[in-house]
Amino acid sequence: MKFNCDDNLGKLAKWLRTLGYDTLFSQDIEDTELVSRALKEDRVILSRDQQLKRFKSAEKNLFLLSSNRPLEQLREVLKKFNLKPEEKNHFTRCLVCNTVLIPVPKKEVENKVPPFVFKTQEKFFYCSKCDKFYWAGTHVKNLKKKISEQSLL
């Protein structure tokens, strides 16, 4: 399932990406463009904006959230679409741009990541769009804990 979050749902977009869902997020996008792109790419529009109901063509692709809190919004989306996030898909997308991350052999990141990170981490991933390397640092541990605490699995 693919999503398109409107410009007020940046935190929800990051959470969906964290769980491995293909989720677009564009700031300053016109409603017509948001709807057009969602229809063209068969994406569900996630929004709190009741004005989007005026686009009859988007009716089946629109889910209006009731909460304004990101984790509650995430829970709404998972429930509505009966999604069961699989741990193998967690942290497989760039949280910034949504690109699928590419596994990279450790030897290829030497001198491209901080020395301490290179010494302490074994797995690395690369975002070809952002040109950045990622690894499972303490932020990943903290996000996994939050996912577990929120019963999102």
Predicted regions and their residues:
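Short, glycine-/small-residue-rich phosphate/pyrophosphate-handling segment
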Residues: T92-R93, P105
